[in-house]
């Protein structure tokens, strides 16, 4: 059983006036697949490196299986890492690359052979064991890098953007490979990415991080915005940042006020809210106050039947760009000065400049405080 506890971890670099990572607090369960996701500079890789022992922890405690390991060397933490750049030895065969770490730890020849061949079978590399890295595709090289970690049989696997060097098609297949490998070996895993699709498809839980400029503007501070399952983050974002980061295309946002049971914006949006939403917002003190209304592209419909059923939730907007994606069409539209997106039926393709009527499924909308950007519930 392997659990990790990151107890209020802080990181400040020498000669810096601010923390690069601030109050990172997380408990990771045995065999859990955790993904750190966020924009560049949010501290996700720095946090991973602190777990690995490659960066010192300025403040806070890191525990592995209940033992504080802040001062333990990386080699003594029983952690295996997979990096973005593969880090393979070009003059060695696949077999020798995978066996190298075990040889350094003085494993017997028989034990090395058994572990390498087992890992190769899991990763589909058996027929490539005698080849050199130059003779492999990008995806095969990444599997070798993963194999080198798997043979270690480490307590914890750390993966730092392992798919970012691969093309889009290969990333999709490798995501499936990583998920399959995790199910098979069941190791506690921390995975870092800037790609929210990777996070949503791989994670048991996601840690969303943000970066904000420090007061003197000399750097950024990385903070945790929300931790939860992919479904929790998608359906119940804690704030506007999380709502806008998770989902592709991103959630649409409108600056609105509530007037006579309707959401009203300066750009011409006027749609009725549900009775339950109205009561909730008024009970929270948002009657006649500015707030932010968020709605996902898939919750906006161009169906005539829906428009006839919900006329008080329908608006007219101008098409800016229309993308036919085969099974669906993405409409990028403008309402006054506000741009937004709608995911509609493939047949609803429109030329730029056309006016279209769209119905908002307000019941699936989200509300955020205009000042704090925190979710209103």
From Swiss-Prot:
GO biological process terms, semicolon-separated: carbohydrate transport
Presence of the UniProt keyword Membrane in the record: yes
Residues engaged in binding ATP: 38-45
Keyword Cell membrane assigned: yes
InterPro entries: AAA+_ATPase, ABC_transporter-like_ATP-bd, ABC_transporter-like_CS, ABC_transpr_MalK-like, ABC_transpr_MalK/UgpC-like, Mo/tungstate-bd_C_term_dom, NA-bd_OB-fold, OB_MalK-like
Compartment(s): Cell membrane
Molecular function GO terms recorded: ABC-type transporter activity; ATP binding; ATP hydrolysis activity
Keywords for the protein's UniProt record, in alphabetical order: ATP-binding, Cell membrane, Membrane, Nucleotide-binding, Sugar transport, Transport
UniProt similarity note: Belongs to the ABC transporter superfamily.
Task of the protein: Involved in a binding protein-dependent transport system responsible for the uptake of melibiose, raffinose and isomaltotriose. Probably responsible for energy coupling to the transport system.
Name listed for the protein in its UniProt record: Multiple sugar-binding transport ATP-binding protein MsmK
Organism: Streptococcus mutans serotype c (strain ATCC 700610 / UA159)
Encoding gene per record: msmK
């Amino acid at each position: 059983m392997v659990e990790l506890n990151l107890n209020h971890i802080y990181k400040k670099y020498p000669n810096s006036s601010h923390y690069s990572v601030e109050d990172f607090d997380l408990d990771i369960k045995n065999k859990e697949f955790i993904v750190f996701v966020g924009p560049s500079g949010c501290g996700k890789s720095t946090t991973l490196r602190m777990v690995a022992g490659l960066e010192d922890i300025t403040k806070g405690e890191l525990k592995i299986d209940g033992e504080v390991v802040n001062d333990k060397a990386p080699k003594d933490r029983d952690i295996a890492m997979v990096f973005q750049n593969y880090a393979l030895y070009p003059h060695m065969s696949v077999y020798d690359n995978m066996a190298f770490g075990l040889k350094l730890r003085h494993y017997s020849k028989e034990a090395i052979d058994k572990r390498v061949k087992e890992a190769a079978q899991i990763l589909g590399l058996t027929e490539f064991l005698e080849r050199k890295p130059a003779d492999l595709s990008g995806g095969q090289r990444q599997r070798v890098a993963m194999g080198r970690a798997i043979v270690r049989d480490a307590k914890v696997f750390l993966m730092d953007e392992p798919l970012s060097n691969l093309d889009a098609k290969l990333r999709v297949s490798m995501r499936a490979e990583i998920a399959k490998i995790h199910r098979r070996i069941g190791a506690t895993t921390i995975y870092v990415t800037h790609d929210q699709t990777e996070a949503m498809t791989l994670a048991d839980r996601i840690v969303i991080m943000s970066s904000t400029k420090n007061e003197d503007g000399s750097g950024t501070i990385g903070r945790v915005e929300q931790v939860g399952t992919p479904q929790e983050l998608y359906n119940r974002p804690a704030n506007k940042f999380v709502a806008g980061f998770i989902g592709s295309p991103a959630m649409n946002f409108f600056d609105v006020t509530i007037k006579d049971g309707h959401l009203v914006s300066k750009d011409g949006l006027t749609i009725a809210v549900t009775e339950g939403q109205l009561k909730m917002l008024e009970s929270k003190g948002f009657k006649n106050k500015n707030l932010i209304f968020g709605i996902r592209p898939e919750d906006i419909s161009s169906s005539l039947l829906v428009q006839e059923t919900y006329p008080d939730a329908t608006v007219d907007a101008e098409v800016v760009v229309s993308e036919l994606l085969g099974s669906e069409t993405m409409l990028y539209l403008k309402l006054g000065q506000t741009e937004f997106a709608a995911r509609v039926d493939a047949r609803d393709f429109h030329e730029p400049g056309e006016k279209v009527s769209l119905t908002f499924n307000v019941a699936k909308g989200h509300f955020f405080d205009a000042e704090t950007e925190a979710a209103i519930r």
